[in-house]
């Protein structure tokens, strides 16, 4: 069981997710001048993390053929067969649904809309189009990675100031 949990966790790209969430969390603190509403902060943090993890899983689902021929990505759970594409898809949908529910119920629509737009951008536009479009693909694709400070801010404040 723990092997499976570990493999599902790997679908979220935890190294990248960790860095994204540091910036989201820091912006939550700064947006409230160190006076956080803990419910909004925790639900926003978890919701953003779940949706970001979902987009990482979608990226691995769509890229598994490419991942299988690269040394750096050749041991990912879908490539190795430890998790099926179907199971990974269900996991990604679950994370997207729970993350969305948390943000919509406890935070606000603006945060959800921005987070969902980031999910679409990374999971589909970057993964299927930009990645193969030329030398500036990573710069344009970096838009998704730059969103967490804004997402964290709006999760606790509700506006873009």
Feature annotation, model-predicted:
Residues 2-9, 18, 22, 27-30, ...:
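Alpha-helical transmembrane segments of multi-pass membrane proteins predominantly involved
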Residues 19, 39-47, 87-91, 95, ...:
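Alpha-helical transmembrane segments of integral membrane proteins
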Residues 21-25, 76-79, 95, 140-156:
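Small-residue-rich segments of transmembrane alpha-helices in multi-pass membrane proteins
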Residues 22-26, 30-64, 100, 113, ...:
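Membrane-embedded alpha-helical segments that form the functional core of polytopic membrane enzymes
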Residues 104-110, 127-136, 153-160:
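Membrane-interface helix caps and helix-loop-helix hairpins in membrane proteins
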């Amino acid at each position: 069981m723990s092997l499976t949990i570990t493999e599902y966790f790997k679908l979220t790209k935890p190294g990248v997710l960790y860095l994204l969430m540091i910036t989201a969390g820091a912006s939550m603190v700064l947006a409230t001048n160190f006076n956080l509403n803990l419910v909004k902060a925790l639900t926003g943090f978890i919701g953003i993390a779940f949706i970001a993890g979902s987009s990482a899983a979608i990226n691995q689902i769509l890229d598994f053929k490419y991942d299988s021929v690269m040394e750096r990505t050749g041991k990912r759970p879908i490539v190795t067969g430890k998790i099926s594409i179907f199971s990974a898809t269900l996991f990604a949908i679950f994370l997207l649904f729970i993350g969305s529910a948390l943000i919509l119920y406890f935070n606000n629509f603006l945060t959800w809309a921005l987070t969902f737009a980031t999910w679409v951008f990374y999971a589909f536009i970057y993964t299927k189009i930009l990645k193969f479009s030329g030398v500036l693909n990573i710069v344009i694709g970096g838009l998704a990675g730059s969103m967490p400070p804004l997402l964290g801010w709006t999760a606790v404040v509700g506006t873009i100031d």
